[in-house]
Design a protein with these regions (language model features):
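Accessory alpha-helical DNA-binding modules that contact the DNA backbone or grooves
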Residues: 10-215
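Short, small-residue-biased leader/transition segments that mark boundaries at the very start
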Residues: 1-5
Length: 216
C-alpha cells in the first residue's frame, strides 16, 4: 500500500534568498509582440491579446498539425517557426497553399531539399482527407478537444451545420456545456474565422463527418 506524503510550508526564510533576487511579476505585455496580456477565464494562464502575435500563431499551427488534430507527418516546429517568420503562413489555411510556393521553398531550403519539401507537401495534401473531427480539433476552439470534437461532428455531420448551431443544440451534445457552446458560437461568428474556413473548404479540406465515425 502506498502512502501519500503531503509537503507543507512551515515558514518562509527570507534570509535564504540569493542576493539580488527579484520577485516574479506576471507580465502585462507580451514579450514577443508587445501587446497587452490577459488572464484566460477560469484558468491561471496568461495569454497575449493580439491576433497577429507570431508566438500565438506558431502555437496554433503546432496544435493544428499535431497528432490529435490534422496529424501532418514531418511538419516540425522548426519548419513552422521559419514559415511563420518568412510570411508563408499567417493562418491555418495557408498551410494548404504552400504547394504554390514549392520552388521558393526548395530554393530557400526552408524545409530542406526537393525530396524533403515534396514529402511534406504530400503529407499536407493527404491530410485534406482526414475525418472532419480532426479539423475541428485543430481549429483551437477553447474547451473543444479531440473527444468533444468527435462527439460534435458525429452529431452535426458537417462543419456548415455546426456553424449554424444554437446554444441549445450544442448543449444537447453529451459533455458540451454552456462554456464550450459559447466558445464554439464565438469562433464561428468571427468573420476572420469564417474566411479561414472558406479557404480550407476551397482547398479541398474535408468538412464532413464520416458515416462510420464514432466516439471512442
Amino acid at each position: 500500500r502506498q502512502m501519500c506524503i503531503r509537503d507543507r510550508v512551515k515558514e518562509v526564510r527570507k534570509e535564504k534568498r540569493p542576493e539580488g533576487w527579484k520577485r516574479f511579476v506576471i507580465p502585462d505585455v507580451c514579450p514577443v509582440c508587445g501587446a497587452k496580456t490577459e488572464r484566460e477565464r477560469d484558468t491561471a494562464d496568461i495569454k497575449c491579446t493580439s491576433p497577429n502575435c507570431p508566438a500565438q500563431l506558431e502555437r496554433h499551427i503546432i496544435n493544428f498539425v499535431g497528432r490529435d488534430a490534422m496529424d501532418i507527418k514531418g511538419f516540425g516546429t522548426v519548419y513552422i517557426e521559419e514559415l511563420v517568420r518568412m510570411g508563408y503562413i499567417k493562418n491555418v489555411a495557408d498551410i494548404f497553399s504552400l504547394k504554390e510556393h514549392r520552388e521558393e521553398l526548395i530554393a530557400q531550403g526552408i524545409i530542406g531539399k526537393e525530396k524533403n519539401t515534396d514529402k511534406l507537401l504530400e503529407a499536407i495534401e493527404k491530410a485534406k482527407q482526414n475525418d472532419a473531427y480532426k479539423l475541428l480539433t485543430g481549429l483551437g476552439i477553447p474547451n473543444v478537444g479531440k473527444a468533444a470534437a468527435k462527439a460534435i461532428m458525429k452529431h452535426f455531420k458537417t462543419m456548415e451545420r455546426l456553424s449554424e448551431a444554437s446554444e441549445e443544440e450544442l448543449t444537447a451534445v453529451g459533455d458540451i456545456g454552456k462554456v464550450s457552446a459559447d466558445c464554439i458560437r464565438s469562433y464561428f461568428s468571427d468573420e476572420k474565422n469564417q474566411v479561414v474556413l472558406q479557404r480550407l473548404a476551397q482547398a479541398g479540406v474535408n468538412m464532413t463527418a464520416e458515416e462510420s465515425e464514432t466516439v471512442d
